[in-house]
């Protein structure tokens, strides 16, 4: 388990490139036949990937010990979105087949969660977020058709995109976790510009669908003290509540966003005009 501490905005503005990458970038999400896990002190979110190729992968008892509980989801909820081939997630004996760009929500208290691919030649890639939970809500599979879509932006500003909200109150109840997948329209490169912050929630962006020579310039920091990270395929960025989070790619890309915090109101944002950025 990789642990990322909370960091004050005054500290972050002093960091060089290596320091920013160390504090905010998760470089390695997928490892064959293993799970990865990054624990952030910011709202206690956990971020990672599970890539079952030749064998079943489960999050073991050692994680419970690190979290001070008997098992991973004893006091947590889990959201998973598959960006690879079709796979199976088994939750306490209940099997869910999860295809590409399909999601599964797992409620607090699930004791045994395992992950498999249907074909080792086209393995599933399960990207997940987990947040502390106070009660148990039902497990639920969400297909792309069942997600709540919202199209924003314009071709003229190169930010036309469709936000597919998988794990949000309009689709299913959760304690605090929300997740979705944003697809840019052909010829568009920007996400979330004009940008915003939300003091009530932190967020993690996971970028994918990028070839080796594609990169995203992910903008972060306070509006008057912006910085950037160069993000490559299947890497994630932790965004504190005080930071903007926006990106522009050298080519089109897709990203998954996940939020935890005070509320689940998607539109609760503090918008920032482009003219205010520095």
UniProtKB/Swiss-Prot annotation:
InterPro entries: KduI (IPR007045), KduI/IolB_isomerase (IPR021120), KduI_N (IPR027449), RmlC-like_jellyroll (IPR014710), RmlC_Cupin_sf (IPR011051). Its EC number is 5.3.1.17. CDD domains: cupin_KduI_C, cupin_KduI_N. Keywords: Isomerase, Metal-binding, Zinc. Pathway: Glycan metabolism; pectin degradation; 2-dehydro-3-deoxy-D-gluconate from pectin: step 4/5. Transmembrane segments: none annotated. The keyword Magnesium does not apply. GO terms for biological process: D-galacturonate catabolic process; D-glucuronate catabolic process; pectin catabolic process. The keyword Hydrolase does not apply. Its cofactor is Zn(2+). Disulfide bonds: none annotated. Binds 1 zinc ion per subunit. One of its GO terms (molecular function) is 4-deoxy-L-threo-5-hexosulose-uronate ketol-isomerase activity. Catalyzes the isomerization of 5-dehydro-4-deoxy-D-glucuronate to 3-deoxy-D-glycero-2,5-hexodiulosonate. NCBIfam families: PRK00924.1. Belongs to the KduI family. This is 4-deoxy-L-threo-5-hexosulose-uronate ketol-isomerase.
